[in-house]
């Protein structure tokens, strides 16, 4: 069902992700000392028994819990999953429903939200899962369907959408067992996608009085039109920072161009594209609003997961973390990021299984200056010196411990730090 508002990720979510069939495939990079950092790792989450594909849509603060959905293309059924400690759990469905999808998770991973689906009728209902029980959140008065997308850090506030038999849609907010209709920007449809940490700020999209699709930010009972980028007439807000001050999403225009965007201090910023591509979408943002993730197309039908930072701009995660990717594997999209920016989830192509799978990327702890013990074995020795020499000249925001002084460049200063402290702790 398409309510005329959703393109990009939402359309992809509804049709099973078909638009991401072609991946941004890269060859793995081997190096003696994995300059990207010692603690970085990529975990393919697999899929549920009987399912052939999986997508991750949310991650807990510590990266231990990931939620999403798995798809059986034979039976054409979806199931919500919760992954923890290497095990993917099928969350089941509500009574009377045979399918489900999970989109949001609380900070501690204990609460999961999404929707249950009746495959025969197309009926769907928002759910909140906790302590092994899937709760039907019902619908607001006058509505017959509901869908949960986002949840507050403590799991007490849920946001999403409700629809009528006439296919009108409204952004909604659930708290204390009651759904609240957030209204629209003057049109007949609105969707809520994300909520601030404390549940007080909601972002999403709405049609305005002229039927343009616009991003909104709702707070204190007021829905604010966030406008769009110059040269773009529509905007889509998908995620919000912990305090509600930073919003990310994408803008589009009649020419079919899409740009990942970031809103702060009342202004939209164009986050750019990868390579010669002309299409990017931002889907997740860190707690402080400084790190953004999403997807960008480098060619028609060929998308790559990206990360954007104020200093580094937009980077292809397939290149930044090539050392943890095997030949033929690729990170197609990044859908969410942990509050501290360390963990990124999404989906890609796992060459080992030949299928689309959810992934968990641990980018490693943020850079902390040190005395030259690159491999953290307590001794500044030949191994540390070689690590810096092999990485010498590299630049970027994710160099790992070879960037001894954390200035985003492996240079003379890092080499001198190792030499000055050579032999320490040995």
Where in this protein do the model-derived segments appear?
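Ubiquitous "structural anchor" signal
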Residues: 25-26, 257, 386, 416
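A general, composition-driven signal for non-globular sequence regions
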Residues: 8, 13, 32-34, 395
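N-terminal secretory signal peptides that target proteins for export/translocation
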Residues: 1-18
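Conserved "turn/edge" positions that cap or connect secondary-structure elements
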Residues: 35-367
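Short linear sequence motifs
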Residues: 13, 31, 209, 383-385, ...
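Exposed boundary/loop context
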Residues: 9-10, 30, 371, 401
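Cellulosome-associated attachment modules in secreted, modular CAZymes
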Residues: 324, 328, 357, 364-426
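Bacterial N-terminal signal peptides
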Residues: 19-32
């Amino acid at each position: 069902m398409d309510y005329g508002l959703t393109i990009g990720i939402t359309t992809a979510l509804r049709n099973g992700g078909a638009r991401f069939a072609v991946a941004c495939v890269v060859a793995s990079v081997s190096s003696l000392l994995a300059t990207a950092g010692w603690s970085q790792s990529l975990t393919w989450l697999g899929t549920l028994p009987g399912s052939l594909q999986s997508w991750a849509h949310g991650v807990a603060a510590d990266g231990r819990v990931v939620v999403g959905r798995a798809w059986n293309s034979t039976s054409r059924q979806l199931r919500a999953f919760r992954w923890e400690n290497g095990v993917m759990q099928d969350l089941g469905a509500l009574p009377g429903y045979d399918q489900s999808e999970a989109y949001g998770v609380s900070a501690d991973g204990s609460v999961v939200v999404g929707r249950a689906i009746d495959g025969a009728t197309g009926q769907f209902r928002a759910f909140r899962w906790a302590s092994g029980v899937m709760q039907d959140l019902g619908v607001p008065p006058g509505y017959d369907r509901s869908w949960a997308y986002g949840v507050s850090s403590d799991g007490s506030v849920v946001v999403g959408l409700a629809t009528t038999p006439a296919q009108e849609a409204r952004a909604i907010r659930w708290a204390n067992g009651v759904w609240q209709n957030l209204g629209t920007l003057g049109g007949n449809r609105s969707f809520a996608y994300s909520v601030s940490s404390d549940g007080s700020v909601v972002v999403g999209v709405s049609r305005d009085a002229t039927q343009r699709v616009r991003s909104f930010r709702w707070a204190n009972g007021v829905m604010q039109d966030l406008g769009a980028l110059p040269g773009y007439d529509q905007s889509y807000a998908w995620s919000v920072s912990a305090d509600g001050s930073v919003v990310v999403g994408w803008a589009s225009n009649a020419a079919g161009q899409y740009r990942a965007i970031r809103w702060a201090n009342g202004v939209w910023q164009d986050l750019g594209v990868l390579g010669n591509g002309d299409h990017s979408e931002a889907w997740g943002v860190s707690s402080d609003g400084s790190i953004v993730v999403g997807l960008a197309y480098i060619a028609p039908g060929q998308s790559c997961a990206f990360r954007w930072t104020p200093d580094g701009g937009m980077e292809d995660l397939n290149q930044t973390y090539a050392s943890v990717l095997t030949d033929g594997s690729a990170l197609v999209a990044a859908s969410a990021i942990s509050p501290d920016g360390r963990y990124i989830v999404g989906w890609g192509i796992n060459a080992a299984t030949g299928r689309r799978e959810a992934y968990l990327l641990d980018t490693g702890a943020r850079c902390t200056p040190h005395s030259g013990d690159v491999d953290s074995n307590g001794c500044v020795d030949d191994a540390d010196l070689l690590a810096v020499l092999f990485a010498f000249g590299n630049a970027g925001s994710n160099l790992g411990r070879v960037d001894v002084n954390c200035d985003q460049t492996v240079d003379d200063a890092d080499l001198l730090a190792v030499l000055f402290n050579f032999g320490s702790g040995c």
